[in-house]
Amino acid sequence: MSTTPAAGVLDTSVFIATESGRQLDEALIPDRVATTVVTLAELRVGVLAAATTDIRAQRLATLESVADMETLPVDDDAARMWARLRIHLAESGRRVRINDLWIAAVAASRALPVITQDDDFAALDGAASVEIIRV
């Protein structure tokens, strides 16, 4: 039985799940969490692309809820990890959306798991120290 890690990186899907009322397995979410600049960008796109003012307000509230959270940047270590993961995917014949690849690279470069509801990360689980926790 695995234990909940001390810290982790929340993927965009966790914020969207909260916004839309999807259930999260809170017991698997670490006490210390951060997110990435990539997730912030995805949440901002959601605000800008909202079809109605009500949806825009809801998405803006989600974006604002992240304001005080530690936001991890894409740095040289993350870029090196991204390149390793990209080659791993090419060699294994699998694909991951580009933003998810960046989120995984930022997390793995800091030895942190990705906390997500997306199945998209499955192709990376275990690759180059990537740990994925589905909540």
From Swiss-Prot:
It is found in: Secreted. Its main location: secreted. It is an enzyme of class 3 (hydrolase). InterPro entries: PIN-like_dom_sf (IPR029060), PIN_dom (IPR002716), Type_II_TA_system_RNase (IPR050556), VapC_family (IPR022907). Keywords: Hydrolase, Magnesium, Metal-binding, Nuclease, Secreted, Toxin-antitoxin system. GO terms for cellular component: extracellular region. One of its GO terms (molecular function) is magnesium ion binding. The keyword Transcription regulation does not apply. Mg(2+) binds at residues 11, 100. Residues 9-130 form the PINc domain. The keyword Nuclease applies. Belongs to the PINc/VapC protein family. This is Ribonuclease VapC5. It comes from Mycobacterium tuberculosis (strain ATCC 25618 / H37Rv).
